[in-house]
């Protein structure tokens, strides 16, 4: 069905829940002659088989609550320091904790840390730059940042750390 309408649509939204789904979707698109942009969720990070369909793989863009730039100088410095101090490698979960702690410490800086003051400062939309994602809340209580990632020539690359809302 998609092949019959592929010349009238811009792309296809294909979220996955298992890394092996990526290869199945990509190969089916190639076999069916469907040459569309693919939009998905962060589970595409776990995908396998990108190399079997490079032209189609290069059309993949997805959102994610994390993106780690392993080539970033600040990340490399932090990772080395963390390994030397804690004796373990930095991973995604460690970065979630580190970025959250950095956010909380930034929130309570320069205020009397009462519940009310903390709430107001969080709702003010203060932005904190993190290694896995930027963090900013308002009175909706959800992080306003989402990473937009694409797969290009065998590498996942950050397109933007997009901030929604006001």
Model-flagged regions — what are they?
Residues 1-166:
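Extracytosolic ligand-binding ectodomains
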């Amino acid at each position: 069905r998609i092949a019959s309408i592929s010349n009238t649509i811009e792309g296809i939204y294909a979220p996955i829940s298992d890394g092996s789904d990526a290869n199945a979707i990509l190969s089916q698109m190639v076999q069916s002659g469907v040459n569309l942009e693919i939009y998905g969720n962060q589970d595409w990070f776990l995908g396998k088989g990108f190399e079997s369909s490079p032209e189609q793989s290069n059309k993949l863009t997805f959102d994610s609550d994390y993106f780690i730039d392993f080539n970033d100088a600040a990340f490399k410095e932090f990772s080395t320091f963390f390994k030397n101090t804690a004796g373990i490698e930095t991973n995604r979960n460690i970065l979630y904790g580190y970025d959250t702690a950095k956010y909380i410490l930034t929130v309570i800086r320069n205020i009397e840390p009462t519940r009310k003051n903390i709430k107001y400062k969080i709702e003010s939309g203060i932005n904190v730059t993190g290694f896995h994602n930027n963090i900013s809340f308002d009175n909706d209580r959800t992080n306003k940042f989402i990473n937009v990632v694409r797969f290009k020539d065998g590498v996942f690359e950050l397109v933007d750390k997009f901030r929604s809302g006001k």
